[in-house]
From Swiss-Prot:
This is IMP-specific 5'-nucleotidase 1. Signal peptide: none annotated. It catalyses: IMP + H2O = inosine + phosphate. Transmembrane segments: none annotated.
Amino acid sequence: MTSRYRVEYALKSHRRDEFIEWIKGLLAVPFVLHADVENYDTDFMKHYEDPEAYEDYLLSREYEIALECQNRYKEIFADVEKLVNHAIIIDKLQDKNPTYVDTSRLRKLVPSVGRFFTPLPLTEAFLVEDSRRSISKRRLVSPSFNDVRSILNTAQVLALAKMYQDSDESGSRLKLITFDGDVTLYADGSSLTPDAPVIDKLIKLLSMNLFIGVVTAAGYPGQSGVPQYYERLKGLIDRIRTTPELNDHQRENLLVMGGESNYLFRYDNEFGNLKFIEADEWYLPIMSSWDKLKIDYIMSTTDKHLKHLQKKFKLDDMDKTTIIRKERSIGIIPNPGYRILREHLEEMVLSCSMKLQEILARTARTPVNMEIVNQLDTSQAVSTQNAADDHIKVCAFNGGSDVWVDIGDKSLGVESLQKYLCKDVKYEHKVCPILKSESLHIGDQFASLGANDFKARLSACTVWIASPRETVAILEDLIQHLSNK
């Protein structure tokens, strides 16, 4: 019963990515029809009664079957690649003429699919991942979610590398790479130690004159917040300070965006550490227009609602949980030695997201769409948006062991970095503008609609990883391809 529950729970629609699931469905057909010699070959019957001869016959056909499967899979990825290119063309036409009403074939098939800022060489990426994961050689396990996720990641890296190789210094190329913190750069709740393998990769990217940003939910305002971020990134910051691989200009290309999009820090050579950047130097116009009283009201109402949920689920004992309220975020965290049930975390993040919809509907100058999104990934973040300039973006998300509500989201965090860096006169605007197609966000929270890192898809190309080890692997690939220029 427990095993069945876990399987069914994991397969809930709100935990799926529709685009990946759709590709999985396409790949299931050739797997069923071509991945087993018995499915299309009758010669096996001659050897069926002799187990040894039958086994030898199957082994003799392994290569042929794998090649057939690979070709079938390649055909599918080639077709999906064309659909992505068509979607990019239609999106560009709509950007030029908003009255253009045609919808791309891909968006008709997968309505929830987001925008693609670069073409995706999926066929090439599939061959790369097939050589690593032996997808075509499998007979009992069909192409999986992680297979498709890895192929999409590799395709994005290949696309950015090709753009980088084809450009000159002032042309369109990869300029900014941002990262989530927990589970992406370091283990959940941990920090970057001096021996972390990802540090070498980050230093190499900085030495290539790329901007590196850490866009994290952890929010510590002001210069007084520097020690907390230093504690999280100590290994990297110490290495940047002392390494001869970087010049002073490159050292200051490290930035940290805290609280999703609320607090900006930058490495400063004089400080030898991070320096807090005042909001008026980097806030986007939409963020500057937000009413502080309205923000306080959102925080106060959410605080009250969290206390209600804390009491409702009997989490209000002093040894169980604590509600922490900051300037632009509020959350409920477990006390040492206690663990909040996964179901309670999901209930709380769903409840908070719905409460936020109500709050924003009451406070917005223009009515907020009250339709709750069809797919809510309660293990991730739920973000609310409206076209109105005064509408405050709010993000409710599950950090894995706690639940937080932040003002802003990572789409604003990444976009703020893009705009802020172009204000720096020392770059003589050679890097400007930093386009969405020239930015890459790497994170672990992309499942379904409204997730924490999911929002970064609005402002940059993305890579979906599942562990710091995967981050190192994808950066190795990226550096290798960029260095081939």
